[in-house]
Every structure is written in structure tokens, then in C-alpha cells.
């Protein structure tokens, strides 16, 4: 029916119910289907391209790296030096600063896609992905919405499935008593762009992770009055120690020292640079920052100026929320704050359980299959960007996934060629 570099429509009617033939187009992919055109998906695709393995990238948005383009605030910079955030086989340009802005990172990702000629199928949302045990193949059902074609349904049939949607696909919005009666502006941090609209306002920031800290700092810089809700203990580290990235310093020390000693060293240096954060309402966990990251996946906050604002009182630390009322919030310690706006820096979660049937991703997850094999599941299922190790970890996983798929693809292709050659010889011998 049709053929191109990445996909070919073939006769697979034996896999379909009669109603499927008329309700959706079925496409055979002679390689993996990659779900997600963010950094993880692009990295896998580029390495597959380099090894001449065909693939298809499915992306629900109308652009690559949609979370970076649509759900990040204007002042955002990468928290780690650029060498730890670049994707495989194409470094950042030399003129990019050590900590690129979000715009520089997006431009880098777009140039990465152009360099490797990666062409995702945009506006195509995966509805379900299920492994067909009878045929040993994945069935990925999608919906395409476009001005040109309107509403179309597709089913991709493939041997390998790469889940690269990441852990931040959907916003986490907790329920709070009385929030519907608050009457003021309520926004998730994923929709926050700048503090300009909050100038002169009293803003409650719910959450004290990296997003909560940066939003609070940005609000201060725009003459707003932020109060940050801190419900649990948190590790705050300086972004740099004596001009060297804290992350890079940690990586270097980990080569020679056990985790507990690296943690001890980091906390001593942090105490010298930031002081005792406990007295400002930021209590530290009993477990060290790296051990906590490894065991619970909780990332430490890298300070870029919020701590000095907390010390000066410009950012106020407050207890957990009891309930909201009209124009106010009551805290668990009994205090009542009059506020104008609420920003929910309450994080994100994966949307994979909603479309990957039978919760197959659980077979890959860090809990059941820890690093370094956390990227590989069963029956040709792979995941990139789910091991909680940021962009550097995702790039490492991407290369592992691409290499593993390429080896399988080349072996299966070789076997198919042998089978065809054997049949051809038989035809000649009977001629």
C-alpha cells in the first residue's frame, strides 16, 4: 500500500478484527516506535539513525521538547553544567554559557533534530499500547488531530516499543479544602512564566523543590511577597562550590569515596556556604542528599539565590496548609495568611499508566529493575528518562537502548535475509 524510509504498510489483516480494518489505518514499522520527542526520545532516535535502524517517533504536541517549550518559566536555566545536559554525538556549541537558558537549550534540541534529520509525527497522541503475545509484536493505537486531515486513527505494529515520555508528562494538582472558595488566582508552576503579573501581590507558593524555590525567587525579583509552604525536610545545596559545579564535584568524589562520605563532605561545605538552614524553617533529612536521591528518588535543591532571600525575610517559610478560605489560607500551625494568589509547585507525574496496558512499565521501573538495567523491560519494551538521573542519565540510557535495539534489529534482519535466500535457492533447484 505505501512505503517510506521509516514505515511501510503491509498485509497484517491476520492481526486485525474486521471492524479495525475500516476504523483505522494500520502501519507496520520495521524498527521501534518511540513515544515522545523530548530529549530522551531524540537521543534514542539519533543513535538509531547513526546505526541505520528505521524508527518512528510519535509526539502528542506540535513541537519537539514540548514540556520545555510550553511548561517552563522564562528565567529558567539548566541547573547543571552543559556538558552534563548535552545529548549523545552532538555537544553544545562552544559559545553557549556553562548554564544554558531554557531558550538556548530548546534551540540546541531543535538543531539536534535538524542535524540528525529527525522527523517526529506531531499532534499524534498514543491512546494505548499493548503487546500481542500471539504474534510477538506491539500494537500502538494513536489519534491524529490536524487542520489538514482532521481526526484520524492509526495503529502502529512494531517489534520494539520505546517509552520516552519522561516522568513529568502530567501536572500533579493536590486537592485542598476550601480552594474553590479562595476566589484568587490559582496557577500550577507548569503554567507560570514570570512574576511580572504578581507585582505587589501576596503569593502562596506550595512546594519547596527546585521549582518552588525558583518561582519564589522570581516573585521576589518582581516585587511580589511570596510565602513558601514547606511540609517536609529538604536538602538545599549550593549550585557551585568554590567555582566548581556541586554536581561535578559530587561525580568526581564518587569515583574515590563511598556515598556516605561524599554526603558528609557536601553537607560540611554547604554549612560553610549557606549556613544552618534549619533555623530558617528548612530542616534537613537525616539521610544524606545523594543517598536520599538513590534510595527515594528525591532530588536536592540547588540554590541560585533563594536562600539569601529567605534569610532576609523576603521569602517567608510557612507550615503546611489546613484549608483555604476567601482571600486567605489557614496553616496547620494555626496561623492565617491573607493572600492574593496561589502557585502550585507540586510537581509532575508520568502519564504512561493511562496508555501502556497491563502496567508493563512496572517491569522496567527503578524499583524492580534498578540501574544500570532500568531501561530494559520484556518483549522489546524499553524506557528512557525514568531512572531519576536527569538529562545525563537519560542520555546514557538512550545510548544503551539504541545499541540493544540495533543489535536485535540487525540480527533479525540477517535471519530474514537467510530465510529469503534459502527459499530462493529452493525455487531455483525446482525450476
Curated annotation (Swiss-Prot):
Superkingdom: Eukaryota
Gene name as annotated: YUC7
Pathway connected to this protein: Plant hormone metabolism; auxin biosynthesis
Protein name, UniProt field: Probable indole-3-pyruvate monooxygenase YUCCA7
The family this protein is said to belong to: Belongs to the FMO family.
Lineage: Eukaryota, Viridiplantae, Streptophyta, Embryophyta, Tracheophyta
Role of this protein: Involved in auxin biosynthesis. Belongs to the set of redundant YUCCA genes probably responsible for auxin biosynthesis in roots.
Cofactor(s) listed: FAD
Positions that bind NADP(+): 207-212
Record organism: Arabidopsis thaliana (Mouse-ear cress)
Induction notes from the record: Up-regulated by drought and by abscisic acid.
Keywords, alphabetical: Auxin biosynthesis, FAD, Flavoprotein, Monooxygenase, NADP, Oxidoreductase
Amino acid at each position: 500500500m505505501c512505503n517510506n524510509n521509516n514505515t511501510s504498510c503491509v498485509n497484517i489483516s491476520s492481526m486485525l478484527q474486521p471492524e479495525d480494518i475500516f476504523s483505522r489505518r494500520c502501519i507496520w514499522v520495521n524498527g521501534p516506535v518511540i513515544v515522545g520527542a523530548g530529549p530522551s526520545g531524540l537521543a534514542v532516535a539519533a543513535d538509531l539513525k547513526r546505526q541505520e535502524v528505521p524508527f518512528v517517533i510519535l509526539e502528542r504536541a506540535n513541537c519537539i521538547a514540548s514540556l520545555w517549550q510550553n511548561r517552563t518559566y522564562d528565567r529558567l536555566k539548566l541547573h547543571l553544567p552543559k556538558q552534563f545536559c548535552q545529548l549523545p554525538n552532538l555537544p553544545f556549541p562552544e559559545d553557549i554559557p556553562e548554564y544554558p537558558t531554557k531558550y538556548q537549550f530548546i534551540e540546541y534540541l531543535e538543531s539536534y533534530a535538524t542535524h540528525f534529520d529527525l522527523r517526529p509525527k506531531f499532534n499524534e497522541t498514543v491512546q494505548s499500547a499493548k503487546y500481542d503475545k500471539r504474534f510477538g509484536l506491539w500494537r500502538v493505537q494513536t489519534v491524529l488531530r490536524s487542520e489538514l486531515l482532521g481526526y484520524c486513527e492509526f495503529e502502529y505494529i512494531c517489534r520494539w516499543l520505546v517509552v520516552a515520555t519522561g516522568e513529568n508528562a502530567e501536572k500533579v494538582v493536590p486537592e485542598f479544602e476550601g480552594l474553590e472558595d479562595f476566589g484568587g488566582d490559582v496557577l500550577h508552576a507548569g503554567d507560570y512564566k514570570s512574576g511580572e503579573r504578581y507585582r505587589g501581590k501576596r503569593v502562596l507558593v506550595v512546594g519547596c523543590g527546585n521549582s518552588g524555590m525558583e518561582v519564589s525567587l522570581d516573585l521576589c525579583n518582581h516585587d511580589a511577597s511570596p510565602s513558601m509552604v514547606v511540609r517536609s525536610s529538604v536538602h538545599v545545596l549550593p549550585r557551585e562550590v568554590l567555582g566548581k559545579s556541586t554536581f561535578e564535584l559530587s561525580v568526581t568524589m564518587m569515583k574515590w569515596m563511598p556515598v556516605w562520605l561524599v554526603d558528609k563532605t557536601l553537607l560540611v561545605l554547604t554549612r560553610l556556604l549557606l549556613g544552618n538552614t534549619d533555623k530558617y524553617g528548612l530542616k534537613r533529612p537525616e539521610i544524606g542528599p545523594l543517598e536520599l536521591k538513590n534510595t527515594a528518588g528525591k532530588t536536592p535543591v540547588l540554590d541560585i539565590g533563594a536562600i539569601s532571600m529567605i534569610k532576609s525575610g523576603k521569602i517567608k517559610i510557612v507550615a503546611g496548609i489546613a484549608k483555604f478560605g476567601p482571600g486567605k489560607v489557614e496553616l496547620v500551625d494555626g496561623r492565617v495568611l491573607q493572600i492574593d494568589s496561589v502557585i502550585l509547585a507540586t510537581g509532575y507525574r508520568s502519564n504512561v499508566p493511562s496508555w501502556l496496558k497491563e502496567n508493563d512499565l512496572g517491569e522496567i521501573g527503578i524499583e524492580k529493575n534498578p540501574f544500570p538495567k532500568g531501561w530494559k523491560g520484556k518483549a522489546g519494551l524499553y524506557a528512557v528518562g525514568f531512572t531519576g538521573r536527569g538529562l545525563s542519565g537519560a542520555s546514557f540510557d538512550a545510548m544503551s537502548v539504541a545499541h540493544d535495539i540495533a543489535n536485535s534489529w540487525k540480527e533479525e534482519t540477517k535471519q530474514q535475509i537467510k530465510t529469503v535466500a534459502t527459499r530462493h535457492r529452493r525455487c531455483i533447484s525446482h525450476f
